[in-house]
């Protein structure tokens, strides 16, 4: 009996440590993603993206933090907060010095959705048009229109950030049960939103993060016909990416992604 209790105690202790192991890595990834060191942030982003839906609650929580943590060691990275431009390098259309926008960047890359975070850095004369196109429910309200007309460009940027965060939170409130990245990829390719289509196509071509269930068989059965259709559209960014996927008959784009 004594031996039984000892074994039971050790099993419980082991379960506690296993549970701690599962929680601790994500918290460490979150901490790294909030870092000011760009290589650390980029590495954490990829690892968090590999966890799929498991990181989304943390990303939504990060959107409550809109402080600026200016990135360092960015090299030739091209993004709105960059202080030097080298004429080449990775391009990111998000002001990722801003923590809540950084969370939105990862969430949009993970889900292939367009919540609006990339519109914050647009030229002053494009901000109102972006609001009308991406947040029509807000824009078409007369009192909101009056308020919008009184805003400076800085105020419009703050408004876009606020509306993007609200859109992301509302989406997750309704989508959290049963969401998975594979279905999201399929939906984005079928979307009428060019940005969603391009994100999904770019992921297929160049993405190195996990999408559970994405296999050659799944592609041929569910995605290939969509890609062929997108290759014929007039939007250059969409058709060019789709054509390049079709040309990759060896499925090299699939081999660079983690295996399930």
What are these regions (language model features)?
Residues 7-15:
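Bacterial N-terminal signal peptides
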Residues 20-260:
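Extended repeat-based scaffolds of very large eukaryotic assembly and lipid-transport proteins
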Residues 1-4:
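Positively charged n-region of N-terminal signal peptides that target proteins for export
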């Amino acid at each position: 009996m004594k031996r039984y209790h000892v074994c039971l105690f050790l099993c419980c202790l082991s379960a506690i440590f296993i549970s701690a192991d599962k929680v601790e890595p994500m918290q460490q990834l979150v901490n790294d993603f909030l870092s000011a060191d760009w290589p650390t942030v980029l590495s954490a982003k990829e690892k968090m993206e590999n966890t799929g839906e498991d990181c989304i609650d943390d990303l939504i929580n990060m959107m409550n933090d809109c402080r600026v943590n200016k990135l360092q060691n960015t090299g030739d990275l091209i993004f709105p907060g960059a202080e030097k431009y080298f004429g080449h390098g990775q391009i990111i259309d998000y002001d990722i010095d801003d923590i809540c926008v950084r969370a939105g960047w990862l969430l949009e890359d993970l889900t292939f959705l367009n919540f609006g975070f990339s519109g914050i850095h647009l030229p002053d004369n494009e901000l109102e048009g972006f609001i009308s196109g991406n947040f029509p429910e807000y824009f078409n309200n007369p009192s909101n229109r009056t308020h919008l007309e009184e805003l400076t460009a800085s105020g419009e940027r703050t408004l876009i950030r606020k509306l993007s965060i609200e859109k992301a939170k509302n989406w997750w409130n309704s989508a959290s049960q049963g969401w998975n990245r594979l279905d999201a990829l399929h939906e984005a390719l079928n979307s009428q939103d060019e940005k969603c289509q391009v994100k999904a196509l770019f992921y297929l071509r160049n993405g190195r993060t996990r999408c559970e269930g994405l296999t050659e068989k799944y592609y041929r059965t569910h995605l290939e016909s969509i890609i062929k259709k997108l290759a014929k559209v007039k939007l250059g960014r969409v058709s060019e990416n789709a054509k390049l996927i079709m040309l990759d008959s060896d499925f090299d784009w699939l081999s660079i992604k983690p295996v399930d």
